[in-house]
Amino acid sequence: MGHAYYANYFYWFEQARGAWCRARGFNYSDLEDLGFFLPVVEAQARYKGEVKYDQVIEVVTTVSEIKRAALRFDYVVRNSETGQICTEGYTWHVLMGSARKAISIPADLLEMLNREPYCDPTTP
C-alpha cells in the first residue's frame, strides 16, 4: 500500500516519549532502577494523513495533563518537509511502585513535569 503500518505510530510515540525524557535529564530505565514503572494504560491515534515509507517525520511530544498518579503525553506526527500533520495521538500512564500499585508522582518528578511548558502541539 506504500504507507506505514498503523501500529508503527505507537512505536514512534514510545520513541518520542523516551527522547522527551532524555532531553529532561532522565531515562525510563532510571525510573525502573528506583522501583517505579510507568505503563501505558490508554493509547489513541487519529490518522489525518498518510506517512509513506522512507518519508522523514518528526514527532512533537508534550505533557498535557498531570494527575496524582497519572500523566498524559500528547503526540503530533508531522511530515518534516511540508509540516503537514499526519497523526495526532496520546498515551495515558500510571505511575506504579514495586508492588505494581498506583502511587503518587514523587515531588522531584512532579517538579520537573510542572516546569514543562504546556502548549498546543498542533501549532508549528
Per-region residue spans from a language model:
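Hot-dog-fold acyl-thioester-processing enzymes
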Residues: 1-40, 97-124
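Hydrophobic aliphatic residue packing
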Residues: 3-4, 40-41, 59, 77, ...
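Hydrophobic beta-strand-centered segment that forms part of the acyl-chain substrate-binding groove
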Residues: 20-71, 88
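HotDog/MaoC-like acyl-thioester-processing domains
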Residues: 51-56, 64-124
